[in-house]
Regions:
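Bacterial N-terminal signal peptides that target proteins for export
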Residues: 1-9
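C-terminal motif of bacterial Sec signal peptides marking the signal peptidase cleavage site
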Residues: 19-20
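A short C-terminal boundary segment appended to hydrolase-like catalytic domains
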Residues: 26-33, 285-372, 377-380
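Extended active-site neighborhood of metal-dependent phosphoesterases/phosphodiesterases
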Residues: 27-39, 43, 64, 101-195, ...
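Short, well-ordered beta-to-alpha junction loops that form the rim of enzyme active sites
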Residues: 168, 198-202, 246-248, 306-307
Length: 383
């Protein structure tokens, strides 16, 4: 009887332990937790990829012209739709108030054509996207972008490249996000040709905090630390590092330590004028509403700045800056196997998505009848 009693007690102890663990499992997390896991989406099917990078759209009531110029924003969104890019990377401040449902409804309406044409959007969290009630803002954000599965930072594999998306409301080079970033830089350093990094706050900018230029922001210490990490690693890497940021409502292009930096905050938010330095690689000190078209091949990346001016209701598009970034000198590249993909995750889920020639996410057969593959990497869904 004593042995039986001990067996029952041991059984109850094990059950209690399992239940307590289950209460903290990924599937039971709150929708608004700050927990995060790794996430990788593979877009296979071609060595040449075309995508758009831009930000600071501030979707909001078009009749309120203080936060943004709605006609500019709408024109840029329409122009991007006509381009039919593989995907769009938005570097934050998608809406004006993250917890305002009406702002997100403006996003729903004005970006509807992208969803109609199956253009995926890979977002970055900006300070305005988190404005107001934190939980409500995150819920609104994740509801619009289910593909990222509630991850605040994540990676997107495509062709010979990867896009690493960071949350600059948290430290980029320390803590969980910092460990994740360094791990991925190591993973892809010599196996891919280009590593793109997208975040909201810029590591480099000639903008100032002074408001005499209509507003602006200088670079923060946190992003300067990120730049030092990237530039210290670049000489030892085969992959070239390219960084897209926003927050400053203008366009900038900087090269430091072998890393190319773009500020692409000209998506419609009220513009900041920048007192350009002589060393700045782009010198137009005026208003620069724009989006960037990025063409990536194994040999080079071409970034074209598409600038919009509207006068008397007429749109004028120009391309005042075109940047060609060559691939690194040939070195012994290390192919990434499925084992390498899974070494930092608890599971590998493979899904089949059949796409059209633009690599969009329609579930239909490609011309050759073979589906493209989407691969998700992660150990459970973060809240």
């Amino acid at each position: 009887m004593q042995i039986k009693g001990r067996t029952v007690a041991l059984f109850l102890l094990v059950v209690g332990f399992v239940l307590s663990c289950g209460s903290h499992s990924p599937n039971n997390r709150s929708d608004h937790s700050d927990a995060r896991t790794d996430f990788t989406l593979d877009i296979l099917g071609g060595s040449s990829i075309r995508f758009v990078a831009f930000g600071d759209t501030r979707f909001h009531d078009p009749s309120d012209t203080t936060p943004a110029n709605a006609s500019v924003r709408q024109a840029i969104v329409a122009a991007i739709d006509k381009e039919r890019p593989t995907f769009v990377s938005i570097s934050g401040d998608i809406v004006f108030d993250g917890d305002d449902a009406s702002d997100w409804k403006v996003w729903d309406s004005e970006s509807a054509a992208w969803r109609e044409h199956h253009i995926p959007v890979f977002p970055v969290l900006g300070n305005h996207d988190l404005k107001g009630d934190h939980d409500t803002a995150l819920a609104n954000y994740f509801a619009r972008f289910p593909r990222v599965e509630k991850n605040r930072f994540y990676s997107v594999r495509f062709g010979n490249c990867v896009l690493l998306v960071l949350d600059s409301s948290q430290d980029e080079v320390s803590g969980e996000q910092g460990e994740w970033l360094l791990r991925h830089l190591d993973l892809y350093a010599n196996s891919l040709d280009f590593i793109f990094i997208a975040l909201h706050h810029p590591p480099y900018t000639s903008s100032l905090d002074e408001k005499r230029y209509g507003g602006g922001h200088s670079a923060r210490t946190r992003e300067q630390s990120l730049a030092r990490v990237l530039e210290s690693r670049q000489p030892q890497m085969h992959a070239r590092l390219i960084v897209f940021s926003g927050h400053v409502h203008n366009y900038e292009h900087h090269d430091h330590g072998g890393v190319t930096y773009f500020v692409t905050g000209g998506g419609g938010a009220h513009p900041y004028l920048i007192p350009r330095k002589p060393s700045d690689l782009y010198q137009d000190s005026g208003i620069n509403y724009h989006y960037l078209m990025v063409d990536a091949t194994p040999q080079r990346v071409r970034v074209t700045m598409n600038k919009l001016d509207i006068a008397d209701g007429k749109q004028q598009w120009t391309q005042p800056d075109v940047v060609v970034i060559p691939g690194a000198a040939p070195v012994a590249r290390q192919p990434i196997s499925n084992r390498t993909f899974t070494q930092f995750s608890s599971e590998l889920i493979t899904r089949k998505y059949e796409t059209d020639h633009a690599h969009s996410y329609r579930r239909r057969r490609a011309a050759n009848g073979r589906p493209l593959e989407t691969r998700l990497e992660g150990g459970g869904l973060p809240g």
